[in-house]
Amino acid sequence: EAIGFMDEHYAMAGAQLVDCPSDIFAEAEMIVKVKEPQPEECKMLRSGQVLFTYLHLAPDLHQTQALVQSNAICIAYETVTSANGRLPLLAPMSEVAGRMSIQAAAHHLEKANGGRALLLAGVPGVPAAEVVILGAGVVGSAALQMAVGMGSRVTIIDKNLDRLRELDAL
């Protein structure tokens, strides 16, 4: 209901409704999620079952070990690559992360939040904050757009000079 669909809508579309997650994991051949599996979900995975989700394995050794032990077939959205070598499922999340990074920075720069009492945009008589962004990929480019949009003075650093030229031309 919270997202605007009633159980009946799902049932009319052919979905089978169950009462608890363990029923889904016990019966489904494929689990499709957005967030990485929680520890209790990893325990419910079974050999040959397909899990398709963002996994973020690098910082989470316990999750990695649990997934390996499950013998499930785990496909990470962030590793799906298109024919041209791009990461089409990672890009939207990266865009959100880049934009949110500037919002979070603005929040933490406020004096009320323990910051240095800086406004990213500045005000008449007070210069805008200086923002340094490391990396001009999808996250960095989204952060750049947000910071420039707020009126900040931005420096973006990347080893790819062609990418920096491309951004400078915008």
Report residues per predicted region.
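Conserved beta-strand edge residues that scaffold enzyme active sites
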Residues: 1, 24, 81-82, 161
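An N-terminal-biased, well-structured beta-alpha scaffold segment characteristic
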Residues: 1-66
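Glycine-rich phosphate/diphosphate-binding loop of Rossmann-like nucleotide-binding domains
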Residues: 1-5, 114-170
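Short Asp/Glu-rich motifs
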Residues: 4-6, 29, 85-87, 166-167
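Generic secondary-structure signature for well-ordered alpha-helical cores
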Residues: 15-16, 30-36, 69-73, 79, ...
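A broad detector of short, well-ordered amphipathic alpha-helices
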Residues: 26, 96-99, 103, 141, ...
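Residue-level detector of alpha-helix initiation sites
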Residues: 36, 96, 137-139
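Glycine/serine-rich phosphate-binding loop and adjoining beta1-alpha1 elements at the start
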Residues: 39-130
